[in-house]
Structure formats: structure tokens, C-alpha cells
Amino acid sequence: SNPRIGEAFTRLLRALAEGTIDPHEQNTTVNCFLGEDECMSAYRAAEALTSADQPEEALQILTNAVAKLEETGHFADNETTVYRVFDSYAARLVYNQVKAGTLPAPQDCTILQDKGKETQLAPDSYAFCLFELAYLLYSRDHIDEAIRYAKKAITIAPTMSAGYRALGRIFVFNDDFANARATLESALTLMTSPDDIAALYYHLAYALWKSGDPETALASYIKALQTSNVVSAACVSEIEELQKDTGLPLPLSEDIDRLLDEARVPLVPTESMRAVLEEAAITALDEGLFDIARVLLSFVFRYRNDDALVGVLRSLETSLF
């Protein structure tokens, strides 16, 4: 009943009949069935062009690829179905829980609009193109278009941090600190990956600093450092600059959560988020879905250092190899 599936089978059978692919080569067979990913090709080409200092050409390639995909209507939301992108089992789990109303989310969370609809997957490359478009448009001062693509990216990939970070950055550099803070704090409540959480605290810290709240900004920078080292170099550099500008001392590590809480900055992951991850990991174990259980438990372990969890994780890793 799905025309795209029919086209895929026709393409694969024709290639097999003509002998243009080897049926024993799994990757070749899968790629033939899926067809050419024009968005991924455009994304890679745009990366190369951006590195070669040709941003206008990169913009054109990405814009054309996204427009071509959207013209097909294959991944257009409708009254019964939405198309979304996820980068991990945990991200999909959070989406499902928010959509079902069993995990709290901000009132402006785009996931809430998906209630009652079937969720199907869109290509990852579609989201990557939207992220890159938002960044390139912002860097070329096409602010309104950059905001539009960043918001579209958030809708398509609501549990990935890149769209929120792009939108937050655009707001900050247009001195719209209220919207920057709201965007980044909303994103924090939906993330499970320590790297994503750290990156969001880092971007939030900069927004807080430039909005005139350097004390909370310092706490947010340190929270990012406590969470992951993915943005450590940038955090240290900006902390030094902030202290040079303001003369503020570093807050004590044990005071960070209190300072953020007093400033109404979300402390994540919340207990409810941790409980959802742990319960899902146990369910996956019971069902024999060991790969999924390992991924979920690895997140739980990052936030709850438990010797028993170490043993379970090691056992799972052994069973997978």
C-alpha cells in the first residue's frame, strides 16, 4: 500500500535481474533498496564547500536538496501521521513518553502536537540538512530564514539538541535572551546524552552571561564541565573571559545545583527521566533486547554510579560479542 516500498522493491528486483548488484553483498543490496540519499549527498557536499570557504554554494546545494525532498511529500506531516528523526533508543523512548503524557515536558514542546498521531521515521540526513541550513543562514545574516529552518529542525528532530542549539544561538546574537533561554531550557528537559546536556548548559551559560546574569552563567558553565568534557575547552576559555570582565570568583562545586535551582534553571536529567530510562532498560533485559538494554543502562550509569550496574553492563557487553 506504500508506493515508496513498491518503488524500492521494483528498483531492487530490476538491479538483481540486470546483474548490476551482487546479491551476496549485503550493504550493496540494502543501499539499492533504499535508493540514493540525496540529502546525505548534499550534506556531505555542503560540508566540503563550507570547509573550502564557499558558504553560498553550500547553501544552494542544501536548499535544493531539502526543497526536492519536501516536494515529494513523502515525509510531510498530515492529520494522522508525523515523520520524525531520532539519534538513539533513549531519544525515541523520551519522545514516546512525552507524547503519551507520562513524562513531563514544557508547554511549548513540539512533541505535544504529535499526540494521537502515528510516528514514522524520516531520514537522518533530512535533519542534518536542516541543522546545517540554520547555521549557514544565520552566519550569512539571513536571520528570519535561519529561525524558520531551526524551528523546522526542532519539529523533525525534537529529542536532538542541534536544532535547539542553533535556534538558541540565533536568538542570543540578536539580543533576544528571553527566547534563547526558553529554547535551551526546554531542550534540556528532553535530553538523555551527557554530551547533549553539557552542550546545552554551555550555550545557556553564554546566553545568561550576555543577558546580565554572570553568576548563574558561571554555575551553568561548571554544570556543563561536570556533565561531560565535550565542551570543556570552550567552557574554560569563556569562564576565564567572564571572570576577567566581572571579577567574580568560581562558585564551589557542591553549590552548583543550588545556584541553578535558585535561578530556575532546570537540573537534568530529572528523577522522572532517570526512572523512565531505568524502567525501560529493565523491560529490555526481560525481553532479551540486550543491545537496547545496554544503551539505556549506559545512560543510567552515567547519572547513577552503581557497582551493580557495572556488573550488568559488563555482562551485556560480553553477551553481544
Task: Describe the residue ranges of each PLM region.
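Alpha-helical linker/edge segments of TPR/alpha-solenoid repeat scaffolds
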Residues: 5-9, 13-23, 87-115, 175-182, ...
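"A position-specific structural signal for the A-helix of alpha-solenoid helical repeats
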Residues: 37-40, 44, 132, 166, ...
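Short coil turns that delineate tetratricopeptide repeat
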Residues: 70, 124, 158, 192-195, ...
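TPR alpha-solenoid repeat register
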Residues: 75, 129, 163, 197-200, ...
